[in-house]
Curated annotation (Swiss-Prot):
Keywords linked to the UniProt accession: Acyltransferase, Amino-acid biosynthesis, Arginine biosynthesis, Autocatalytic cleavage, Cytoplasm, Multifunctional enzyme, Transferase
HAMAP family, per the entry: ArgJ
E.C. designation(s): 2.3.1.35, 2.3.1.1
Family, per entry: Belongs to the ArgJ family.
Annotated organism of origin: Caldanaerobacter subterraneus subsp. tengcongensis (strain DSM 15242 / JCM 11007 / NBRC 100824 / MB4)
This protein's name: Arginine biosynthesis bifunctional protein ArgJ
Lineage: Bacteria, Bacillati, Bacillota, Clostridia, Thermoanaerobacterales
EC category: transferase
InterPro entries on file: Arg_biosynth_ArgJ (IPR002813), ArgJ-like_dom_sf (IPR016117), ArgJ_beta_C (IPR042195)
Length: 403
């Protein structure tokens, strides 16, 4: 598998664009993705009971498992906007269908930005016309920039692999920085591939990888109204349709998991005001669910986040998070390690105090990527979660978001 981190190379049959429509004060704010051929899709949405209008629309349209275009705007979430919000989301899809000469039902809509403000539809509809005229094979970068809100860098990856002599390309790009919490929050992710994949197979692969990647990240514990992750597979590589239980499926799954994992880590790394990426590895748990519960609790703990920001090896906060996570474990067996490029230090042994080198721990925590390893010593299962520290800048950014 060839890996192109940070690169967007649109697969066969896909074009994209990103333009300035005027929703935001400046910068690109409207993206369009189009496939020459109707594609199989799978999608996962926010679990927040308060769902944005485009999420409500997409959840219904995604049931048929087909789509040909996605329109995305940033700067306005079109959430908590009532029936008018639903009408506006439908109008966006209708406009895309008109300019691309495709079926309206084959258009998905995504929005991200400020909640509770109506969309400036005149600007949006005009922007869609411009975006359609701007579609190109090189337009992926513009599209990726157009979906960003408080993001500080582009989040993208492309992988290439071969299936039975057919070259497959898979590219993904995402946005997400704040209001990120396990089970999908304020993040949009789009994975495009020219592979031919059976619908049921695509569904299983995508939902499994989402569960192990996007659903294992946390920036601030807030859950958004707009989360959406979509994969489109248009089959234009002309390979035999991939089915579960085959060698070809294993290749496809590995590629999809890599793309989603890479994007999830980048989202965690770009947490609003973040100075450090945190990766939590819970190992030797009794069950996978126990490992997931513990890993998610640690990465979501504000006390752990602030300790990492302050470069304080406060292992008690880590153990406390495991304690309230709901995981089944014996506290008298738990070991905790802190690790980075500067080395590794054990800070807790068998659930209690361990005489560790404080100066080494301080050096370890000075790095930009910090690994927390929790050994439950209870079984064979493991889970990984990603997050970031919590800094003073997080408050500054979110205290003035609307201004």
């Amino acid at each position: 598998m060839e890996i192109l981190d940070g690169k967007i190379e649109l697969p066969k049959g896909f074009v994209a664009s990103g333009v300035f429509a005027g929703i935001k004060r400046s910068k690109k704010d409207l993206a369009l993705i189009y496939s020459e051929r109707l594609a199989n899709i799978s999608a996962v949405f926010t679990t927040n009971r308060v769902k944005a209008a485009p999420v409500i629309l997409d959840m219904e349209r995604a049931k048929k498992g087909k789509a040909q275009a996605i329109v995305i705007n940033s700067g306005n979430a079109n959430a908590c906007t009532g029936e008018k919000g639903i009408e506006d989301a439908k109008s966006m899809a209708k406009k895309v269908a008109e300019v691309l000469e495709i079926e309206e039902e084959d258009v998905l809509v995504c929005s991200t930005g400020v909640i509770g403000v109506p969309l400036p539809m005149e600007k949006v509809l005009k922007g869609i016309e411009v975006a359609a005229l701007s579609l190109s094979k090189e337009g992926g970068y513009d599209a990726a920039h157009a979906i960003m809100t408080t993001d500080t860098f582009l989040k993208a990856v492309t992988v290439k692999f071969n299936v039975e002599g057919k070259d497959i390309t898979m590219t993904g790009f995402a946005k997400g920085s704040g209001m990120i919490h396990p089970n999908m929050a304020t993040m949009l992710s789009f994975v495009l591939t020219d592979a031919s994949v059976e619908k049921a197979t695509l569904d299983k692969a995508f939902k499994n990888t989402v569960n192990r990647t996007y659903n294992m990240i946390s920036v601030d514990g807030d859950m958004s109204t707009n989360d959406t992750a979509i994969v489109m597979a248009n089959g234009m590589a002309e390979n035999k349709a991939i089915q579960e239980g085959t060698y070809e499926f294993d290749l496809f799954y590995k590629a999809l998991e890599y793309v989603n994992k890479t994007l999830a880590r980048l989202i965690a790394k770009d947490g609003e005001g973040a100075t450090k990426l945190i990766e939590v590895n819970v190992i030797n748990a009794k069950t996978e669910n126990d490992a997931r519960l513990a890993a998610k609790a640690i990465v979501n703990s504000n006390l752990v986040k602030t300790a990492i920001f302050g470069e304080d090896a406060n292992w008690g906060r880590i153990l406390a998070a495991v304690g309230y996570s709901g995981a089944d474990f014996d506290v008298d067996k738990v070991d905790i390690y802190l690790k980075s490029a500067k080395g590794e230090v054990k800070v807790c042994e068998n659930g209690s105090f361990f005489a560790f080198d404080e100066s080494l721990a301080k050096e370890v925590l000075k790095e930009k990527e910090i690994f927390i390893i929790v050994d439950m010593k209870a079984g064979e299962f493991m889970a990984t979660s990603w997050g970031c520290d919590l800094s003073y800048d997080y408050v500054k950014i979110n205290g003035s978001y609307r201004t």
